[in-house]
Amino acid sequence: MNNKADSFFWNLRQFSTLVPTSRTMRLYRLGLCKPKIVHSNWNILSNFHNRMRSTDIIRYLFQDAFIFKSDVGFQTKGISTLTARRIERLLYARRLFFDSKQSLVPVDKSDDGLKKVNLNHEVSNEDVLTKETKPNRISSRKLSQECNSLSDVLDAFSKAPTFPSSNYFTAMWTIAKRLSDGQKRFEKRLMFSHPAFNQLCEHMMREAKIMQYKYLLFSLYSMVKLGIPQNTILVQTLLRVTQERINECDETCLSVLSAVLEAMEPCKNVHVLQMGFRILVDQQVWKIEDVFTLQVVMKCIGKDAPIALKRKLEMKALRELDRFSVLNSQHMFEVLAAMNHRSLTLLDECSKVVLDNIHGCPLRIMINILQSCKDLQYHNLDLFKGLADYVAATFDIWKFRKVLFILILFENLGFRPVGLMDLFMKRIVEDPESLNMKNILPTLHTYSSLNHVYKCQNKEQFLEVMASALTGYLHTISSENLLHAVYSFCLMNYFPLAPFNQLLQKDVISELLTSDDMKNVYKLHMLDTCLKLDDTVYLKDIALSLPQLPRELPPSHPNAKVAEVLSSLLGGEGHFSKDVHLPHNYHIDFEIRMDTNRNQVLPLSDVDTTSATDIQRVAVLCVSRSAYCLGSSHPRGFLAMKMRHLNAMGFRVILVNNWEMDKLEMEDAVTFLKTKIYSVEALPVAAVNVQST
């Protein structure tokens, strides 16, 4: 016993001569010892060789040692201690990092079981006390390959935790991405209840300030995606550390930080990090070399970012246009929509690339492009026609719901792809079984809004199939959805009996009126107008008791140029009326009264003395671009219905396009309206009248 004690204290004295007082061994709560370096310019090898020259081996200082509190050679202030117990291995459960000047020499094992120092070995870059007890560092990729569940990763951590802890969170998120939604929910519950999960979180918080910045970002992103609540101390701590170390962000970290900000919910720390991110991007934008990183940063910068920063990013993207891949060009639409920045040059150039590589374009890409064009109000007819023609050319390989989704997006843009819509109508007529409650309403809305069935060859067959499909769901459809469907039929001038009869029941009407939704009231009024003005013989006797609608408000500034042209053409304002309100809540911009041969405009003062059968009422409507299908003169659903109803009330309708009228000189505008108002035979006479005025 005395020999053992003498040997131990001899070893301790040797150890105290090697370790300076500026080196502290801190014992953490989890039983992991971690050195705290106070001075980094001391080299353990500087005097080691001279001290050990007399002998080739020393006893391994920690073999069969005791942990105890001592003031000899150690700084003990603020250091946790353990009760004295015998240990057979090191307490170092993780890799310890020192600089190269402080690395310990490697240890070999002799035949008698003692460990000796190899003095001739090259100095290592890491402080390795023993190869047998140090756990091997394992990457997140290897963890995700070897483990099949989130619990497996936590089990691996509990057996031999390694630095950095971010690898475990990254591995768990990688595994979670491979699981189905149900499996993912189950695995997350097991993860939160695992005994090692809290320990892993503690390690993560301790290591946040010393691990590489990219690992910190990887772990924060993985935590958010794994569903760890954002208001926890763990996530908020990592957010604060991320803010403090944001200057360490390189190009790779910018990409990861963008993904982190995009995945997180708004809060104070996220807002502060977002502001710091914008400042960092403003400083480093010209240093970004990877196009994908640039697009990720642009997408994350936010719609409320300063316009100067948006333009700087736009200029950077324009500089990199030659390096854009096809995928970069396809992705650029979504990027610009995310930052709410309409760069016509970028959009035009990327549109050309998309059209040149349209074959094989996935549905998801097309959806993103069309949705982004709507958000940016970017109307490129060549792009839309190219996408529609591609879908029409490959129509047979597309499923019903995918084609319908594309058509819905085109309708949102106001674009009418004639060929594609004809093919879709044909498929519906040939396969009515493809219709269900989920696709009947959007199909009706799309075709009625774009006014496509007008003059179509298979119009009647299509409408009958749609009405029959809707009738099959009348026992389950809600009152509001039924109203939407019937309103779509009204726009298409088709009135199926069964849906109308169910909608016009008193309890259904009462339910719709008590919803306090003015859109429902408006549609019911339009339904009532259709019943009175359109050809609905079997429904004309039905009278609806509806609340009064507010009058359709005329434009706050009526088209002054059209009024001036009419005054010049007709011989003064006494020959036409402005802002005329009609029954059924209709409004027209100008009204002119002519003889039935359209040879002469009648002054308003003479109308009362003229027989109504000798008068032709002319309604002049000043319409905007949105009233037509994009890039055409084809009126959309509501304008077509309004024209139909004005005709039923005895009007001849003249459409004047506001944007075209604004471009015309006064003389050309007069000529344009003259050809619209007068008949061909009356044009020479009208020309004489214009010259005289």
Swiss-Prot record:
Top-level taxon of origin: Eukaryota
Keywords of this entry: Mitochondrion, Mitochondrion nucleoid, Phosphoprotein, Ribosome biogenesis, RNA-binding, rRNA-binding, Transit peptide
rRNA-binding in keyword set: yes
InterPro entries: FAST_2 (IPR013579), FAST_kinase (IPR050870), FAST_Leu-rich (IPR010622), RAP (IPR013584)
BP GO terms, sorted: apoptotic process; mitochondrial large ribosomal subunit assembly; mitochondrial RNA processing; mitochondrial translation; positive regulation of mitochondrial translation; regulation of mitochondrial mRNA stability; RNA processing
Pfam families attached to this UniProt entry: FAST_1, FAST_2, RAP
Residue ranges of every copy of the RAP domain listed in the record: 618-675
A GO cellular-component term linked to this record: ribonucleoprotein granule
Molecular-function GO terms, alphabetical: rRNA binding
Location of this chain's protein in the cell: Mitochondrion matrix; Mitochondrion matrix, Mitochondrion nucleoid
Subunit-level organization: Monomer. Found in a complex with GRSF1, DDX28, DHX30 and FASTKD5. Associates with the 16S mitochondrial rRNA (16S mt-rRNA). Forms a regulatory protein-RNA complex, consisting of RCC1L, NGRN, RPUSD3, RPUSD4, TRUB2, FASTKD2 and 16S mt-rRNA.
Function: Plays an important role in assembly of the mitochondrial large ribosomal subunit. As a component of a functional protein-RNA module, consisting of RCC1L, NGRN, RPUSD3, RPUSD4, TRUB2, FASTKD2 and 16S mitochondrial ribosomal RNA (16S mt-rRNA), controls 16S mt-rRNA abundance and is required for intra-mitochondrial translation. May play a role in mitochondrial apoptosis.
Protein name (record): FAST kinase domain-containing protein 2, mitochondrial
Name of the encoding gene: FASTKD2
